[in-house]
Amino acid sequence: MPTTDYQQVLNDITQEVAPLLSQGKVADYIPALAEVDPEQFSIAIYTTSGETFCAGDCTQQFTIQSVSKVMTLTLALQRYGDELWHRVGKEPSGTAFNSLTQLEFEKGIPRNPFINAGAIVTCDALYSRLSAPMHTMLETFRALSGNRCIAIDKKVANSEYEFRHRNAAMGHLMKSFGNFENEVDDVLWAYFNFCAIELNCIELAKAYNFLANNGIDNTSGKRVLPSRQTKQLNSLLFTSGLYDAAGDFGYRVGMPGKSGVSGTVLAVLPNKFTVAVWSPGLNSFGNSVAGIAALELLSKKLDISIF
């Protein structure tokens, strides 16, 4: 479909999902997120040719939460390559994103890098190689998004850190199996700061556009990941990016994706575009009600899929 049609499609989708904005529930287990107005929506496409299309609350920033895990993995792969997979797996979990039972059963090796335990151990790996992990993460998002003012919402980071106990339990459990190198609380502080980075949908789609462009940032022309690793990362996003709703998302949307409890969803159509959508009301799986519906509509209207 010609890119000139994208704007009208996004406008139509924004109107069609409007009745869904009152559905779902914001993530109230993180006090700072519980204060967000649930009836907000934005969606943006950033193409591999550098075109931007957006509808809804395009300039509204939000914390990206678990969508940051994709960049954590990217930075870790840059520094470890395949060595990283000795510490974290590549399989779908089929359980809740913060499950301790599965982690115990599999002797401290998380199923994949997108469940909490997997992201935390990936963050631990980064912590071992970076002197200033939060600075590196911020600078990466600033460079890839084109916004040098990207910042961390410290209120959200502090709120998540205060209620870190289950995530801390995962870290200590992995440490008991010899799969954790640094102080758990130090790593969690970095992890929650990554989650509390604020972008809008345009910035988010642009920052991750290298996933649709064979690993190359099309603004700078610099390679972020080798082409093969980019394909592998997209494969993991398809199988595990939406936790135990990944299969349903793959069936309905047909693209690799990653969600976050702020109501953010990122999706990738290789060689075409990245799309970011945000709407805070969540379903029982912790995914955005309007966001998932919007991406399904996009897939149908453009007749797109990776298959």
Swiss-Prot record:
Gene3D superfamilies: DD-peptidase/beta-lactamase superfamily. It catalyses: L-glutamine + H2O = L-glutamate + NH4(+). The keyword Hydrolase applies. InterPro entries: Beta-lactam/transpept-like (IPR012338), Glutaminase (IPR015868). Homotetramer. GO terms for molecular function: glutaminase activity. Keywords: Hydrolase. Belongs to the glutaminase family. It is an enzyme of class 3 (hydrolase). The keyword Methyltransferase does not apply. GO terms for biological process: glutamate biosynthetic process; glutamine catabolic process. It comes from Pseudoalteromonas translucida (strain TAC 125). This is Glutaminase. HAMAP family: Glutaminase. Its EC number is 3.5.1.2. It comes from the Bacteria.
